[in-house]
Structure formats: C-alpha cells, structure tokens
C-alpha cells in the first residue's frame, strides 16, 4: 500500500543524567543552580501514574462525572555505579569524617532531573538518517527509598557487575510550567542542527531544557506580507485586512496558525472594524516561535 507515514524514529541508550536545584526567579520563571552530572545510569523504568481515575454514573450515563487524583509518577532508576553526586545530591547521604564512606540519613532530596536518550530517524522526504535526542525532564523527582543492590560470589561463569536500583517518584511542579500548566514530566525531541546546538550548549555548561529554550537550527514560521488597505467607507472604522490561516515554515511546510490583531497601543482589534492606523498581526502555532507582520489601514478617499 502507498501510505503517507511519518519519518521513522528509534531511540536507544541513556546518557547525561543531570540533577539541579530549581527555584522561582524574579520573573516567575525557573532558575537552576548546583548542576551536577551523575555517572552510571543504566535505565529508567515504569514511571507510571499512580493517581486513580473514578467515574460516577447518573441517569443512563456511566461517566456522568469523572475525577482524577493528582498526578504521581512512580518508577525506578538503575545505576551501575553510585558516585558522590548520587549519594549526596539525591539520596542525601552523610559523608564520613575520613571521606571514604557515606551513611544514609533518610533525608532524600527533591531535584530537577534531566537525562538524554539517543535517537535516529530517517527523513520521510530525503530518506537521510538524522541523529538526535529525546530529552526527558522530571521537574520534581524524589527518591522513596535507599538504593538496593545484589552481589554474588565469583564463579567459573564470572559475575555480573553490581547494579543499584533506586525507587523514585515525580510530581507536578509549581514552577516548571508548560503553557501555564503544571507538569510532572516533559519529553523533548530534538534533531539535526538543533541537536548539534544542544550538544554544543551542554558541553559549554550543563543546563536544564525548558519549554521556551531556543536552539539554533530551529524550523521557524515565515512571516507573511499583508497588503495595506483602506476603510470601506470614508470616516468609518470598517477596515478589513487579509489575514492568512496558514503560513509556510522555513523548510517549506504548510502550518495552520492562529492570529491576533493589535493596534499601535497594544489593544486587540477586530478585523472588519479597523480604524485608520497601523496594526501588528501576531501569528502562533504549536511548536513554533510567534511571528508578526505589520499592516496599515488608511481612510477611504
């Protein structure tokens, strides 16, 4: 069958586990400090939502009302080594006086946690392979128990390396928001030139990805040219401009957009009721930076 599938993608391998402290900045946006990279991540498994969803019937409708509890993701992280960043910055363990050991305190730390999963896709248009990453962020992640492990005595078959399993939970954040909404987790996908820029930024200084993080090489909307117009009748506020509902992006794709018209004072205006003056039209689409176009309306002669 000749069907129009999306680009083929696969993801494999974990790397670059970063933990950081998060607080609300002066402008209300997250601020991150004390970034540390944690070595030895093997896997992150079964981050399942433990919140119950209940339906309440009424009349002949089985789901007259639906209630869901607060989102609580629970799962585990597996490590092949436990370094200082894991012991002190996540598990809150106390280092011994001689600096050689750590002891549990039960004072587990809540951290913003980010890790990467390698990815590769085959572009549906060019057929070329493109490398990238899936960036997973848990804004509020806390251990729920000390790390567990198993060891075995050497044998003729050899032994497997010890792995430490850490039970964790992730909850919604009041600071790390997506579109004004609290989220317990976000997964980003970055490819090609954006992935290269992400690596460059990460190598120059550890950082946590945010919904408004801008990376070089992003596909952007192309702002349209809107023709200037005159009002329909002299002396009346009845100007109408041509506002497209789709735009081209920088790779030639067609994108459905929404738009808002504002006058020179920033007040929202209604198309078809425009007074003589200058207006700015802002175009928006999910996954793209907003673009604007200017247009003027003159009085009918």
Curated annotation (Swiss-Prot):
Q: Does the keyword Cell division apply?
A: no
What subunit structure does UniProt give? Homohexamer. The tube is composed of 31 hexameric rings.
Function summary = Forms the cylindrical rigid tail tube.
Origin organism is Lactococcus phage F4-1
Q: Name one Pfam family in it.
A: Phage_tube_C
The cellular component terms of Gene Ontology attached to this UniProt record, alphabetical and capped at eight, are:
viral capsid; virus tail, tube
Q: Supply the alphabetized keyword list.
A: Capsid protein, Viral genome ejection through host cell envelope, Viral long flexible tail ejection system, Viral penetration into host cytoplasm, Viral tail protein, Viral tail tube protein, Virion, Virus entry into host cell
Report the locations given in the UniProt record.
Virion
Q: Which InterPro entries match?
A: L_lac_phage_MSP, L_lac_phage_MSP_N, Phage_tube_C
> What name appears for this protein in its UniProt entry?
Tail tube protein
Into which family does the record put it? Answer: Belongs to the skunalikevirus tail tube protein family.
Q: One biological process GO term for this chain?
A: symbiont genome ejection through host cell envelope, long flexible tail mechanism
């Amino acid at each position: 069958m000749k069907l129009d599938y999306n680009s083929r993608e696969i993801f494999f391998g974990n790397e670059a586990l970063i933990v950081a402290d998060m607080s609300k900045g002066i402008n209300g946006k997250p601020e991150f400090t004390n970034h540390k990279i944690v070595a030895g991540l093997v896997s992150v498994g079964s981050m399942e939502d433990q919140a119950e969803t209940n339906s309440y019937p009424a009349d002949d409708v089985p789901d007259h009302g639906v209630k869901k509890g607060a989102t609580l993701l629970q799962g585990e992280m597996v490590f092949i080594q436990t370094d200082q960043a894991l012991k002190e910055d996540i598990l809150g363990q106390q280092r011994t006086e001689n600096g050689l050991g750590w002891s549990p305190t039960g004072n587990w730390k809540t951290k913003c946690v980010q890790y990467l999963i390698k990815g590769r896709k085959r572009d549906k248009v060019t057929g070329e392979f493109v490398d990238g990453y899936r960036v997973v962020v848990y804004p509020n992640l806390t251990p729920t128990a000390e790390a567990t492990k198993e060891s075995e005595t050497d044998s003729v078959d050899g032994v497997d390396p010890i792995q430490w399993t850490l039970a964790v939970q992730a909850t919604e954040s009041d600071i790390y928001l997506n579109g004004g909404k609290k989220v317990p987790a976000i997964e980003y996908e970055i490819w090609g030139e954006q992935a290269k820029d992400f690596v460059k930024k990460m190598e120059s200084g550890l950082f946590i990805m945010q919904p408004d993080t801008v990376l070089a090489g992003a596909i952007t909307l192309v702002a349209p040219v809107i023709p200037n117009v005159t009002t329909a009748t002299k002396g009346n506020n009845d100007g109408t401009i041509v506002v497209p509902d789709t735009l081209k992006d920088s790779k030639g794709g067609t994108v459905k957009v929404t738009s808002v018209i504002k006058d020179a004072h920033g007040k929202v205006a209604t198309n078809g009721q425009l007074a003589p003056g200058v207006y700015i039209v802002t175009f928006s689409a999910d996954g793209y930076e907003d673009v604007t176009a200017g247009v003027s309306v003159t009085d009918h002669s």
